């Protein structure tokens, strides 16, 4: 058979029962009406297409597909054809058989981050219905196994869009490299009502017990976020009473809790009225809303289950603590007892005091909910309900129950504070580049200015850790950078815990308040001081909310190593699905940068596309920064050029032409090693680079060394030198390892608080623990980039290594040849299904969407090949769509012998294009009294394969 017939019909003109014997049919009387000439993307959730929800883009990127009629990997056939081509013959008892490289095929399938969760229907004729905006494509079930959707966000000429390589956008979003950074701030808790109780003239006076004194305020004055009452309070001149208050953000959730509380009270405190799972969900919602509404989802299952058990336990009337709480009289109330029991359950789950910065939303939600009723929770538990932290939870936190903690961490992206409201916020100043020579290099020098504090490595603590290192090797679970730093320790200080109202109602600030903390090892100095809100809350995250605050683009954020001092927000906002919406102003800010036009196809000042402007600029800028810093870590000497000067850190423009060709992070990683160690300037293709990085990360021991030997033989020679370090330059190679193990768009760390060893090129060279995913869950490049900026000069590199340096080499060789830190489990349904989500969102920011469906037809004779049948809308010309889809067959393009591209407009009219061995005609067909159109596809001299040929190809 060399002809293939595709009916194009309307049920009004001909029943499908007369056409259901055809493998493929196009029904044109079911469509989604366009709005203003664009597809109405808002209709996708109610249509039988793919499972993309009608949520904000950030919620959608964390969405777990719910309706699962099957999933499809669009490039599965491309992968299996390549595996078929590369089969090798092997002899066995049955003779010669061809063996498929199943390991490669599994990797290639798993590596594809474009899985489509389908929403399809099966009709009474055993056909699978795939809906497009302009029609429905009906396929017989035997022919449906390779059908997939192809969505393409249309390009806006005014923006000079280029929507190729949207995979790169997905990579940036999953590696925290498409995010805006904004400084951290604190303000008075919105769950507290602070009421003035007395005043004093100055801080040397004490508040008089039993009497009230008024100087500038009146009795009952409430302390807000500005004005004289706030000024007097922040100056520690007002004694206050703390009452609970319900903030507007969580009023609905607190109402739900109060409903449960009232039912519990009315049922005589019957535990069956307490549904722990329901409580836990409400408390989690509170915890998210009050800290970061767009917080990355965490795996709370184990902790949440433990919390639910504790809730059940505390609400049993025979529980001893339940009995004690109900024995207390005085100012105790049943409402207070309800929230006290929740707070105690949360404390027992945490096995210690719960703070607002607790990483688990359900626990911090328990604290916040209790604050709304009790005021300062632990102070009230002790004073009113006679409950204290258990001794087994440690003695350090029990004295804190005498204090009242009135400040809470703010997320400036989310806070509703008004312009002019007072806050306390961090200022974060990164060091400026400085001039140096090849002989001197750029090392960490601990120094501070007048009136500055200093955070550096504590020699005694470091020596203690080093002794443990010598005895037991690298302990990735217990070695922590924060354990070896001096005070004020930038990795442990927390203003929320360090500022409080003391036992005498005096406002106590920490010693570091309003002082610069200098930390050369983090290339920065920081200060927390008073400030105020500068702008109103906006949907667009590119809004510097604080006077003298800081906000940075993703390309600038690499320099900010200390995660607790800022928040991140994806620089996409708004709805996932929309007919049209505005994009973030951050892209216009990028377009104003001096290097924007050299890294993109734009001239300065034009309106830019978030992808061809934002994605490409961000990736290329970051790539230049990474390459330029790693170039300085080259172990080689600069013979004859020792006294040449250069600025550091600074971008080396020699890498620009290579960066412009890169399409994937893996190419960047491989190029670092190829350029510095292998002396190659040729860029590896993205598929090869991704495979190399995968193999390095997922092998260990001798197998990992074999991969390195094949991919980067000269680098391996330097690695082998770690077993017997001779000179300081031999240590440089250690700081290249994190690039191989910590950066990829589809990996997860085994644990987000484990530490890897890196060299800190200080005046004394040290091996320090760098926690992956630590410092507020920063991961990827941000977790280690700060430390690769330091590099020894030639004078240091020539020095002989001492016994300590030799130990560094041995420890790191053992660790990095065996570590499996990058082999954690990813959340496959969430992570792998987001490429189409991003495509649909980009479509709403640019010129709308073009949609199509791809069907594969096998050819059996005279030469085995495939023909692609594409059915789509008229937003793209059929020949352009053909070229776009064929180009996605990276491995097996030579097997595509023909393409037929059918375009259907909103009125059901057709436009068809064929290429290769295929020819087409549009004909009229009559069956009895019914009529329809058919697209007659001919392949002169060729024979189509049977239905199961595709099944065989997909199971090579």
From Swiss-Prot:
Predominant location of this chain?
A: virion
Source superkingdom: Viruses
* InterPro entries cross-referenced by the UniProt entry: Capsid_VP2_Orbivir
Q: Which GO terms label this protein's molecular function in UniProt?
A: structural molecule activity
Alphabetically ordered keywords of this record? Capsid protein, Clathrin-mediated endocytosis of virus by host, Host-virus interaction, Inner capsid protein, Viral attachment to host cell, Viral penetration into host cytoplasm, Virion, Virus endocytosis by host, Virus entry into host cell
Give its localization: Virion
Please list the GO biological process terms of this entry: clathrin-dependent endocytosis of virus by host cell; virion attachment to host cell
**Claim: Heme is one of the keywords in the record:** no
Q: Give a GO cellular-component term.
A: viral inner capsid
The protein's matches in Pfam families, at most eight in alphabetical order, are given as: Orbi_VP2
Question: Which pairs are disulfide-linked?
Answer: none
The keyword Secreted appears for this protein: no
According to its UniProt entry, the function of this protein is described as: The VP2 protein is one of the two proteins (with VP5) which constitute the virus particle outer capsid. It is the major target of the host immunogenic response. Responsible for viral attachment to target host cell, probably by binding to sialic acid. This attachment induces virion internalization predominantly through clathrin-dependent endocytosis.
Stated family:
Belongs to the orbivirus VP2 family.
Q: What is this protein called?
A: Outer capsid protein VP2
Organism, scientific name: Bluetongue virus 10 (isolate USA)
């Amino acid at each position: 058979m060399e002809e293939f017939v595709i009916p194009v019909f309307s049920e009004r003109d001909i029943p499908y029962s007369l056409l259901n014997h055809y493998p493929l049919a196009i029904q044109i009387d079911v469509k989604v009406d366009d709005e203003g000439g664009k597809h109405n993307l808002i209709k996708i959730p109610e249509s039988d297409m793919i499972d993309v929800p009608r949520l904000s883009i950030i919620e959608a990127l964390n969405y777990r597909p719910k309706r699962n009629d099957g999933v499809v990997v669009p490039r599965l056939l491309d992968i299996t054809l390549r595996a078929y081509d590369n089969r090798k013959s092997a002899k066995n008892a049955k003779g010669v058989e061809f063996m498929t490289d199943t390991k490669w095929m599994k990797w290639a399938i798993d590596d594809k981050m474009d899985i489509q969760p389908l929403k399809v229907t099966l009709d009474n004729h055993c056909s699978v219905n795939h809906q497009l905006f302009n029609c429905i494509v009906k396929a017989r079930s035997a022919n449906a196994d390779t059908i997939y959707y192809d969505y393409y966000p249309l390009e806006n000429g005014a923006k000079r869009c280029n929507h190729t390589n949207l995979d790169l956008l997905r990579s940036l979003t999953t590696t925290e490299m498409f995010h805006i950074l904004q400084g951290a701030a604190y303000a008075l808790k919105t769950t507290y009502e602070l009421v003035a109780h007395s005043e004093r003239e100055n801080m040397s006076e004490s508040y008089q017990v039993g009497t009230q004194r008024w100087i500038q305020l009146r009795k009952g004055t409430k302390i807000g976020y500005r004005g004289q009452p706030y000024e007097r309070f922040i100056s520690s001149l007002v004694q206050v009473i703390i009452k609970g208050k319900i903030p507007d953000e969580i009023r609905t959730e607190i109402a739900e809790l109060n409903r449960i509380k009232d039912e519990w009270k009315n049922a005589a405190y019957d535990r069956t009225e307490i549904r722990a799972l329901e409580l836990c969900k409400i408390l989690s919602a509170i915890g998210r809303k009050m800290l970061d509404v767009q917080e990355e989802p965490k795996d709370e299952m184990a902790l949440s289950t433990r919390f639910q058990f504790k809730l059940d336990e505390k609400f049993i009337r025979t529980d001893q603590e339940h009995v004690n709480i109900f024995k207390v009289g005085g100012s105790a109330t049943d409402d207070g007892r309800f929230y006290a029991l929740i707070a105690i359950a949360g404390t027992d789950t945490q096995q210690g005091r719960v703070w607002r910065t607790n990483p688990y939303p359900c626990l911090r939600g328990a604290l916040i909910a209790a604050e709304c009723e009790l005021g300062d929770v632990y102070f009230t538990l002790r004073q009113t309900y006679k409950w204290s932290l258990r001794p087994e939870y440690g003695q350090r936190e029990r004295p804190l129950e005498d204090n009242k903690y009135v400040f809470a961490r703010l997320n400036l992206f989310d806070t509703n504070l008004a312009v002019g409201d007072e806050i306390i916020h961090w200022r974060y100043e990164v060091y400026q580049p400085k001039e140096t020579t090849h002989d001197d290099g750029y090392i960490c020098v601990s120094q501070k200015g007048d009136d500055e504090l200093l955070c550096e490595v504590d020699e005694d603590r470091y020596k203690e850790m080093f002794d443990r290192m010598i005895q037991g090797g690298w302990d990735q679970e217990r070695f922590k950078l924060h354990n070896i730093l001096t005070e004020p320790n930038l990795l442990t200080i927390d203003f929320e815990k360090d500022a409080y109202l003391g036992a005498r109602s005096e406002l106590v600030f920490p010693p570091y308040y309003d002082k610069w903390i200098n930390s050369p090892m983090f290339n920065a100095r920081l200060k927390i001081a008073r400030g105020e809100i500068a702008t109103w809350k906006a949907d667009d995250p590119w809004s510097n909310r604080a006077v003298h605050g800081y906000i940075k683009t993703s390309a600038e954020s690499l320099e900010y190593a200390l995660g607790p001092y800022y928040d991140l927000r994806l620089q996409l906002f708004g709805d996932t699905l929309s007919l049209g919406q505005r994009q973030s102003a951050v892209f216009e800010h990028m377009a104003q940068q001096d290097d924007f036009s050299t890294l993109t196809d734009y001239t300065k000042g034009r309106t830019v596309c978030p992808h061809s402007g934002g994605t490409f600029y961000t990736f290329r800028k970051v790539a230049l920064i990474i390459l330029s810093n790693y170039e300085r870590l080259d172990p080689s000497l600069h013979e004859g050029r020792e006294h040449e000067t250069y600025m550091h850190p600074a971008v080396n423009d020699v890498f620009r032409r290579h960066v412009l060709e890169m399409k994937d992070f893996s190419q960047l990683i491989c190029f670092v090693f190829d350029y510095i160690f292998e002396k190659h300037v040729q860029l590896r293709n993205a598929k090869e680079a991704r495979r190399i990085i995968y193999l390095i990360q997922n092998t260990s021991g001798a197998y990992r060394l074999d991969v390195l030997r094949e991919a980067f033989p000269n680098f391996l020679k330097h690695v082998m030198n770690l077993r017997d370090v001779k000179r300081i330059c031999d240590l440089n190679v250690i700081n290249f390892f994190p690039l191989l193990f910590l950066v990829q768009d589809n990996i997860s760390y085994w644990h987000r608080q484990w530490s890897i060893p890196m060299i800190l090129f200080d005046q004394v060279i040290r091996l320090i623990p760098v926690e992956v995913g630590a410092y507020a869950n920063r991961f990827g490049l941000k977790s280690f980039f700060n430390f690769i900026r330091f590099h020894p000069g030639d004078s240091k590199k020539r020095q002989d290594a001492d016994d300590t340096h030799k130990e560094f080499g041995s420890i790191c060789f053992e660790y990095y040849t065996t570590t499996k830190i990058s082999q954690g489990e990813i959340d496959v349904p969430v992570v792998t299904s987001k490429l189409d989500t991003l495509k649909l969102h980009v479509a709403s920011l640019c010129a709308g969407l073009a949609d199509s469906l791809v069907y594969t037809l096998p050819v059996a004779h005279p030469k085995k090949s495939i023909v692609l049948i594409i059915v789509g809308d008229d937003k793209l010309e059929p020949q352009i769509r053909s070229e776009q889809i064929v180009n996605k067959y990276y491995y097996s393009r030579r097997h595509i012998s023909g393409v037929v591209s059918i375009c259907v407009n909103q009125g059901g009219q057709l436009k068809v294009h064929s290429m290769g061995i295929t020819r087409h005609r549009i004909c009229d067909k009559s069956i009895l009294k019914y009529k329809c159109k058919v697209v007659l596809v001919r392949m002169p001299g060729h024979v189509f394969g049977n239905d199961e040929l595709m099944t065989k190809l997909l199971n090579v």
